Structures are given as structure tokens and as C-alpha cells.
């Protein structure tokens, strides 16, 4: 019997407004934002079981990263709610320092986090999930009109968001062995990587790494220092206030490497793919491998290691501080030289991964590419590292892709509004040659961009764009009213300088009160806080009001607003000067080569980056004050700026 063979037909799926490629932290936020804003969205993922997967450490937040999580939440994103529902430890960091640099970090149950995010995705209206691998785009008249897949699907779309993480030409290294993978256990995306190369995008190569996972049953915790959760644990999401935690809170444990550990690493360094010259990608400066730390800092006799549980129902432990790509046998020997890990068994080896990224200088502040106006990039493909940085970009890409389809101006948060604005402005203005990590030190106005006031800064924007529901917006308004009332209360209550008052102040190493003063005036003293004010001899009604404020959810923000009033006003004045520069828009088609007074280097940088404002131009590396003055003069000629305006 003979059979007639027919070529397989191209499968035509339904048309979609937006396709999101990749379902990590960037892809999930992008897809949810697009769908919640009313657009028919397709989430294309190579394996639906990895939606929301935490590929590296089982934690959300940290220094500056906690700020991002709160900002994502204030705008209507999902990450904060998911970590609140799946957290097994919560800690406030930098509490001995100023409010600008205090941040939150939560350990997650890795499995529950992924399943919770997957459930949110699956139940979201307007959002379709498809297990498929996109390998290219259909481009007509300079715009994307569809995507193709490895199984010959052809899907019509009006905009696309690429959030592929480490999957573009991913290559895993363990010792001198390497193999293609997007992460250990998952294949890479090669077809889509080829598409970016073939279509003239500036593609670079980066590298990151992760730690070996070890069996908790083989760890001796008896002599290790426990690090307990803050109790009661706090929350990231403003939705979670007062709801309480349902999961048990687990401790982490602290141990250290030692000279024996370092000697084992030095002996095996010739088998490190990084030091053998096999890895070409640039690694993360602020998350170096343990072998890199040993070789670069030989004077250090030990390095801290945090043993972090990966969940309630698993024995896997994440030894934070030990990312490595050394051979498995060296990893075992290294681990077993560390106190508490003498009998440790590795469940999953540590490894390094190289991957393609797209130069973010090719992006607009909306995260749309300059080459194709309806193609958006978010996450590690833009050269960043970290779940939180990825999620923030995904949220903004999702918002702006919908606004593009609605022919509305993109939402661009500036550096004075949010850490999200700092992150994106750094990427599109300065670019990056190594995995970018956000720090509070990158923000010029960090006292205004505190973690505790993310809702004050961004909830109204979230409501205006349509992501923040009315219930949450009303809670935000109630909180703002409570802050205002708290400040007014401390302004209204005054106290006289009596012997008892001065004794109480002296006990706190505070100077005598010389004249009748409002409690808000006393609160501006560095050694005084709202809790201390309860000790003062107040009337029954005033004491009750102070106690209520000290125990309220707005206590911290009231305290910061009063205690740092002068500094906040100063930063607000700086912001006004900054905003004047940002409002001076540069024409998109400006021919910089025709402007006299600009060097060839300046012309090249301005022509490449195409800054949207005089402010952005001034932040480009190598753009001198003289060059900014040339641009300012040109804007005057174009009637963009009156000659007597001051900057």
C-alpha cells in the first residue's frame, strides 16, 4: 500500500493584539498588564510548567529591588501579591540606616511562587497561554504583523514584547563542558536569536551563574547562626496589609568559606570555564562567582554564605554566595570544606550560562525598539540582571504596547518619579556592557523615592492608566488622608519645657527643651521618634492620639515626612530644575552633524542614542556642558525655548 504524502499546512491561530514571548518575571508582568488593559494577549512560552519560575535565588526584593517591587505593585503589577502569598521569610534590610536606603526582602517557596503566578496568568481575562516556540517575526512596512513558530504556526499580532531572559543562544557551562540550554533542564531559543542577528540588531553576549542546590538533610545546622524572619512579617503589596501570612516562616542559616575552601578553588581554577577563556560573555560585577571572589580578593580569609530554604515541602537549599561553574567534583569538595556542609550532597550542580542580549541603546524610553516601532524588549534581553528589574521592565513594556495600539503617548516614568524610571533611563541613555543591577546609589532623588512611599508616588498613575482598581485606589486615598492627619496631629500638640520633660529628654541623650514646642518640632531631633513621644507628660487625649499614630500603618511615613522635611524640600527643588531640562524636547529627526560646535564624538553619540530631551542628552557619557549649551541654543532657534528662560 502506498500513501500520498502532503506537506503539513501552516496552522493559523486566532489573531491577537499583543504577543508576549517568554513567561519569566518580565513576560508575566507584560502579559498581565496588556490583558488587564483590555487587549487580546498571547503569552508564548516554551514550557508552560515554567511560567513564573525563579531560575536563580528563591527570593524577591533586596536593596533597591524592594523599591521596585513596591513600585510595580503601586502601578497595578502582580509580583508583590504573589510573593506575599508564597513567602516563607520576610526581613527589613538597612534598618539602622536612613529611610532612603531601607528595603525589604522575602524568601519564597520556589514551587508555590511559580504555581501562584501560573494560576494568576491562567485565570486572567483576555490572556491566552500557548506552549510554543516563536522563532521569528513577520515584518511588513517596518512593523511587526505576526510571528512564526518552530511548528509552522503563523500568528497575526499588532505588537510584540520579547522577554526571553537567558534563552537566546543560551549556553550552560559546568567545568570545561558546555551545552546549549536556556537554563539547566530547558533548551535554548536559537531561531529567535538568529532573527535578531539577521535583522541588524546590535547583539552582545553576557554571562551569569547560579549556585549548586544542596540537600538540607545532609547539612549540620547545630553550630550555624540562624537568621529568623521579622515577626510579625511585613508585606510588599498594599493589598496585603492586615491580611496576615498563611505560610510558616523559616530561618536561613549563616556559614563561611575558609582557607581550605579557597585552596580547593585555587587548585581547580584551571578547570573553570571563565579562567580557561571558554566563556566570552561579560559577567555580573555585583554577583561574582565564588572562584572570581577568591582570585580577585586573595586578602580575604572568608566569604559569607547564606543557606536559604527553597520551600516548605522540599529538602533543597540555596547556598547564597557560592555561584560557581567549576566541575561537579570540585563543587562537592569545595562545599564539604565549609562548616556545617561537611557531608553536604549536591542535588543540582552550580553552573554558568552565556546568552545573547540586545544593546539597550537601541531602545526608546518606552522600551520599544528604534528599528521597529511595535517591537518591545523587556528583562535580561536588555542587559539587566534580577527578577525585580525584569518585572519592572515587563510591566512598562506591557503598558506601553497597549498605549501604542491605542495611539496614546507612552508612559515614561522619569528619574524623579520612580526607581523604574532610573532603571530604564540608565539603560536607554547609557547602555550597559555587563549585567545591570539597580542600587539606591543610582538614584539622585532617593530620599523622595523611598520604599514606603511608592504608593504615594505611583498609585494615582496606576489608576489613571487603568491598571489599579477602584478598591485599591480608595485604600490609597485613605492612607494619604491618614498621613496628612498624622502630621497635623503632631503639629497641633505642643509641650512646655518642664523639669519632667527635660529629664525624659535627657534620658534619651536629647537636649533640654527651651520653649514651648510642637511635637513635630521635637520629632526633628535625630534621637527622637514617634514611639518616644508617648513617654512625654501629655494630656490623656493627646497621649491617646500619639499612641494611635505610633501603632498605625502610616507611622513610618509620617515620621519621615516630618523628620526630613528640610531635606525633602531641597530635593523637591532639585527635581523642579531637573524637570525643566526634561521638558525641553529634542526633535527626533534632528541632524546633529549640522550643528556647529559639536565634536565628532558628541555627534556620533547623540545620533546613536537620539535623546528625547535636553535632560536625557546631558546624562549621556561624554556629552559635555558645552555640547548641552549648543543644543540649548539650537532649541531657542527652533522656538522651543525663549531666550530668557533659565535652566
Curated annotation (Swiss-Prot):
Flavoprotein keyword on record: yes
> What InterPro entries does the entry give?
FAD/NAD-bd_sf, GIDA_C_N, MnmG, MnmG-rel, MnmG-rel_CS, MnmG_C, MnmG_C_subdom, MnmG_C_subdom_sf
| GO aspect biological process, one term | tRNA methylation
Record GO terms (molecular function): flavin adenine dinucleotide binding
Under Gene3D superfamilies, the record lists:
FAD/NAD(P)-binding domain, GidA associated domain, C-terminal subdomain, tRNA uridine 5-carboxymethylaminomethyl modification enzyme MnmG/GidA
Q: State a single Pfam family of this protein.
A: GIDA
Q: Which cysteines are joined by disulfide bonds?
A: none
Any Gene Ontology CC annotation: cytosol
**Positions contributing to NAD(+) binding:** 283-297
Binding sites annotated in the UniProt record for FAD: 22-27, 134, 189, 380
Instruction: List UniProt keywords, sorted A-Z.
Output: Cytoplasm, FAD, Flavoprotein, NAD, tRNA processing
Keyword NAD present in the record's keywords: the answer is: yes
Q: Specify where it is mainly localized.
A: cytoplasm
Q: Which cofactor does it need?
A: FAD
Where, subcellularly, is it found? Cytoplasm
Q: How does it assemble?
A: Homodimer. Heterotetramer of two MnmE and two MnmG subunits.
As for family, the record states: Belongs to the MnmG family.
Q: What role does this protein play?
A: NAD-binding protein involved in the addition of a carboxymethylaminomethyl (cmnm) group at the wobble position (U34) of certain tRNAs, forming tRNA-cmnm(5)s(2)U34.
PANTHER family tied to this protein: GLUCOSE INHIBITED DIVISION PROTEIN A, PROTEIN MTO1 HOMOLOG, MITOCHONDRIAL
Official protein name in the record:
tRNA uridine 5-carboxymethylaminomethyl modification enzyme MnmG
Species annotation: Desulfotalea psychrophila (strain LSv54 / DSM 12343)
Amino acid at each position: 500500500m502506498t500513501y500520498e504524502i502532503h506537506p503539513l499546512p501552516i496552522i493559523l491561530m486566532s489573531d491577537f493584539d499583543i504577543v508576549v514571548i517568554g513567561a519569566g518575571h518580565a513576560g508575566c508582568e507584560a502579559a498581565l498588564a496588556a490583558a488587564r488593559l483590555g487587549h487580546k494577549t498571547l503569552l508564548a512560552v516554551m514550557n508552560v510548567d515554567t511560567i513564573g519560575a525563579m531560575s536563580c535565588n528563591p527570593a524577591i526584593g533586596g536593596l533597591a529591588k524592594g523599591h521596585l517591587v513596591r513600585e510595580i505593585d503601586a502601578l497595578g503589577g502582580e509580583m508583590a501579591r504573589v510573593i506575599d502569598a508564597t513567602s516563607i521569610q520576610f526581613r527589613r534590610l538597612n534598618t539602622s540606616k536612613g529611610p532612603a536606603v531601607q528595603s525589604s526582602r522575602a524568601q519564597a517557596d520556589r514551587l508555590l511562587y511559580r504555581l501562584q503566578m501560573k494560576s494568576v496568568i491562567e485565570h486572567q481575562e483576555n490572556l491566552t497561554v500557548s506552549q510554543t516556540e516563536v522563532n521569528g517575526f513577520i515584518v511588513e512596512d517596518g512593523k511587526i504583523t505576526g510571528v512564526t513558530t518552530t511548528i509552522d504556526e503563523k500568528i497575526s499580532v499588532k505588537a510584540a514584547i520579547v522577554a526571553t531572559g537567558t534563552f537566546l543562544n543560551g549556553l550552560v557551562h559546568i567545568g570545561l563542558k558546555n551545552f546549549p540550554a536556556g537554563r539547566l533542564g530547558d533548551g535554548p531559543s536559537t531561531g529567535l536569536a538568529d532573527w535578531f542577528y539577521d535583522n541588524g540588531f546590535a547583539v552582545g553576549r553576557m554571562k551569569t551563574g547560579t549556585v549548586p542546590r544542596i540537600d538540607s538533610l545532609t547539612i549540620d545546622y547545630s553550630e550555624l547562626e540562624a537568621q529568623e524572619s521579622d515577626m510579625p512579617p511585613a508585606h510588599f503589596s498594599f493589598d496585603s496589609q492586615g491580611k496576615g501570612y498563611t505560610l510558616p516562616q523559616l530561618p536561613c542559616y549563616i556559614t563561611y568559606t575558609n582557607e581550605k575552601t579557597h585552596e580547593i578553588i585555587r587548585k581547580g581554577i584551571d578547570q573553570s570555564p571563565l579562567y580557561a577563556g571558554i566563556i566570552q560573555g561579560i559577567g555580573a560585577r555585583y554577583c561574582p562567582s565564588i572562584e572570581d571572589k577568591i582570585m580577585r580578593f586573595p586578602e580575604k580569609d572568608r566569604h559569607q554564605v547564606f543557606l536559604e530554604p527553597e520551600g516548605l515541602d522540599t529538602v533543597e537549599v540555596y547556598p547564597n554566595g557560592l555561584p560557581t561553574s567549576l566541575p561537579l567534583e570540585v563543587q562537592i569538595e569545595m562545599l564539604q570544606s565549609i562548616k556545617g556542609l561537611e557531608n553536604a550532597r549536591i542535588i543540582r550542580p552550580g553552573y554558568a550560562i552565556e546568552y545573547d542580549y540586545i544593546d539597550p541603546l537601541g531602545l526608546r524610553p518606552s522600551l520599544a525598539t528604534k528599528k521597529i516601532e511595535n517591537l518591545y524588549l523587556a528583562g535580561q534581553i536588555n542587559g539587566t540582571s534580577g527578577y525585580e528589574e525584569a518585572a519592572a521592565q515587563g510591566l512598562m513594556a506591557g503598558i506601553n504596547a497597549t498605549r501604542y495600539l491605542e495611539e496614546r503617548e507612552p508612559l515614561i516614568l522619569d528619574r524623579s518619579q520612580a526607581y523604574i524610571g532610573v532603571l530604564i533611563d540608565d539603560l536607554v541613555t547609557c547602555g550597559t556592557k555587563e549585567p545591570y543591577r539597580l542600587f539606591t546609589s543610582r538614584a539622585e532623588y532617593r530620599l523622595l523615592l523611598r520604599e514606603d512611599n511608592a504608593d504615594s508616588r505611583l498609585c494615582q498613575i496606576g489608576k489613571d492608566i487603568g491598571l489599579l482598581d477602584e478598591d485599591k485606589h480608595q485604600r490609597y486615598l485613605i492612607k494619604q488622608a491618614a498621613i496628612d492627619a498624622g502630621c497635623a496631629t503632631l503639629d497641633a500638640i505642643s509641650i512646655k519645657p518642664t523639669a519632667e520633660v527635660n529629664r525624659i529628654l535627657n534620658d534619651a541623650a536629647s537636649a533640654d527643651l527651651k520653649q514651648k514646642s510642637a511635637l513635630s518640632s521635637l520629632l526633628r531631633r535625630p534621637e527622637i521618634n514617634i514611639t518616644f513621644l508617648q513617654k512625654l507628660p501629655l494630656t490623656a487625649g493627646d497621649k491617646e492620639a500619639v499612641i494611635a499614630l505610633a501603632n498605625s500603618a502610616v507611622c513610618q511615613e509620617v515620621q519621615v515626612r516630618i523628620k526630613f522635611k528640610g531635606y525633602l524640600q531641597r530635593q523637591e527643588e532639585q527635581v523642579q530644575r531637573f524637570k525643566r531640562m526634561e521638558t525641553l524636547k529634542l526633535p527626533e529627526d534632528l541632524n546633529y552633524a549640522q550643528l556647529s560646535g559639536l565634536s565628532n564624538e558628541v555627534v556620533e553619540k547623540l545620533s546613536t542614542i537620539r535623546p528625547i530631551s535636553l535632560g536625557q542628552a546631558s546624562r549621556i557619557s561624554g556629552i559635555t556642558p558645552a555640547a548641552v549649551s549648543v543644543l540649548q541654543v539650537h532649541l531657542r532657534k527652533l522656538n522651543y525655548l525663549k531666550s530668557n528662560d533659565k535652566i
